[in-house]
Design a protein with these regions (language model features):
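Proline/glycine-enriched tight loop/beta-turn segments at coil->beta junctions
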Residues: 135-138, 146-150, 172-182, 188-191
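Mobile cap/lid helix-loop segments that gate and shape the active-site cleft of serine hydrolases
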Residues: 288-295, 310, 350-393, 413-421, ...
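Cap/lid segment of the alpha/beta-hydrolase catalytic domain
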Residues: 177-178, 184-306, 316-317, 362-365
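Alpha/beta-hydrolase fold nucleophile elbow
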Residues: 320-332
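N-terminal cap/lid segment of alpha/beta-hydrolase-fold proteins
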Residues: 102-149
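Short beta-strand/loop motif that positions the catalytic acidic residue
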Residues: 403-405
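N-terminal pre-domain segments of enzymes
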Residues: 36-98, 102
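C-terminal catalytic histidine-bearing segment of alpha/beta-hydrolase fold enzymes
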Residues: 376, 422-466
């Protein structure tokens, strides 16, 4: 690729990323677009057809308050007729899994392969492939601190488990130190081009060939890297750096934790990164695809959670991982994934969630001027007839859990956050474990900056490095 073409590609990509980040985040202002909107070159805005009467305002039905009054959450701890906490957890978890609909079939074996690796500052970065379920062989990033058991020998990796709670115990072979581990769960951000790369810095251009899924399918392909592959690898790298600079203050959470002695794993959620559409990224297609999955008797959001449970089982099977010291963490949708995973997997011993906790009452309302309300990424059919978000998160009790929300986060109104935190503390307090639930409201927007990452590390260290 000549220099002119490369620079053009880089400029176009940078412009598109800047525009995407600007308009997708809650604090973005639309005022700066006024000049371009009045330009004579701008196309005329299409007229919106409207009738005199209506039944929806924005994305919410006009009778939403009536519907919410009917949500009594009968399976919440304290509302349920089950008064034994262990029995309640079992019944409530079963209800959540029932509403998540049919899970993907478990893979017969993980069949892990190391596609490429590079040495970083005190740890090794690997791009791997494994079977997360019977349908999907995916790529993921794995960071291993120096001195750990090698993951190169696939014979040391046990078979996939069909036990969704993590009750079965694995013990990897090999010699070397075992480390605590973290399953890092990426955000949504209305940005689907990258997923795991938001958590762990991707490899550079020279690793593109060996680290591509296509190379797994083309065993006889050339080792040379095409201009197209170089361009994609460079775009992924620059896109990830730009995203992390904006939402994570320029620090990759996964690399940060690996430097401090954790095995770190991160994969793409369905529809993100290397699990997206053949035709390319189109945010508007997400809801259509979620609808198609429901037509197939499956739920896209639930598939994300099922895969998070499965990948945690995979992480526990690795020989360099201490299976009794595994935590999870994430920001935004990653925070939602983190407390869902903590609630449903016994493998997880500690969880951290930054900028995702609310009540349905505060989420689906016009009271706080939210621009978006709900969405398929956290939609599990019928579950609100039984449990609200804080009730589900309370299934993690008495595990240590960290929740941080921001007072400047327009996606999660503080009254709803405080109400959710109050409900969770009631549950932990009822089990004499309130000191293990850390809920904090910081003076931050929707983000996970350096201070929040330091708090996550401190919390993980407190419970995984005793």
């Amino acid at each position: 690729m000549n220099l002119i073409k490369h620079n053009d590609m880089k400029w176009n990509m940078t412009y598109k990323i800047a525009a995407l980040l600007f308009f997708s985040l809650p604090w973005a202002s639309v005022g700066v677009c006024a000049q371009s909107a009045t330009s004579s070159q701008s196309p005329q805005k299409q007229k919106v057809q409207k009738r005199e009467t209506y039944e929806w305002e924005g994305e919410i039905p006009t009778y939403v308050e009536q519907l919410k009054q009917e949500l009594t959450y009968p399976m919440a701890w304290g509302n349920s007729s089950i008064k034994n906490f262990s029995k309640w957890k079992k019944a409530a978890r079963e209800k959540v899994l029932e509403c998540m609909m049919t899970p993907p079939k478990a893979a017969a074996a993980w069949d892990m392969q190391v596609l490429e690796e590079e040495q970083r500052d005190g740890y090794k970065a690997q791009k791997i492939a494994f079977n997360v379920n019977a349908y999907s062989r995916i790529t993921a990033y794995l960071l291993v601190p120096d001195g750990g058991v090698s993951s190169d020998a696939s014979s040391d990796i046990p078979s996939a488990s069909s036990d969704i709670s993590g009750a079965t115990s694995f013990s990897g072979k090999g010699t070397g130190r075992k480390f605590p581990a973290v399953n890092l769960l990426h955000d949504h951000g209305a940005h689907l081009f990258i997923g795991k790369e938001k958590m762990i810095r991707p490899f550079g251009v020279l690793s593109a060939k060996k680290a591509s899924v296509a190379s797994l399918r083309e065993a006889n392909s050339s080792d040379s890297i095409s201009d197209k592959e170089k361009a994609i690898a460079q775009e992924v790298l620059e896109d990830a750096d730009a995203w992390v600079k904006l939402l994570y203050e320029g620090q990759y959470l996964g690399d940060y934790l690996a430097k401090h002695g954790y095995v770190v794993f991160s994969m793409d959620a369905p529809m993100w990164g290397e699990r997206g559409r053949k035709e390319g990224v189109d945010r508007k297609k997400y809801d259509l695809i979620a609808g198609n999955m429901m037509m197939l008797g499956r739920d896209l959001s639930a598939f994300m959670t099922y895969d998070d449970i499965s990948s945690t089982e995979f992480l526990a099977s690795l020989p360099m991982v201490d299976a009794n010291r595994i935590g999870c963490a994430g920001c935004s949708m990653g925070a939602y994934r983190s407390w869902m995973l903590s609630a449903l997997s016994d493998r997880i011993k500690v969880g951290a969630s930054v900028c995702w906790m609310i009540t349905t009452d505060a989420q689906l309302t016009r009271r706080y001027g939210r621009k978006e309300n709900g969405g398929f990424a956290n939609c599990i059919p019928g579950l609100r007839q039984y449990l609200d978000y804080p009730h589900i998160a309370s299934l993690a009790c008495p595990k240590p859990m960290l929740f941080i929300n921001g007072s400047k986060d327009h996606l999660f109104p503080i009254p709803g956050v405080e109400d959710a935190f109050r409900q969770m503390h009631e549950v932990w307090r009822s089990q004499k474990a309130d000191e293990r639930l850390d809920t904090e409201i910081w003076d931050i927007p929707h983000s996970c900056g350096i201070k929040a990452q330091a708090k996550i590390l401190e919390f993980l260290d407190q419970y995984l490095k005793k």
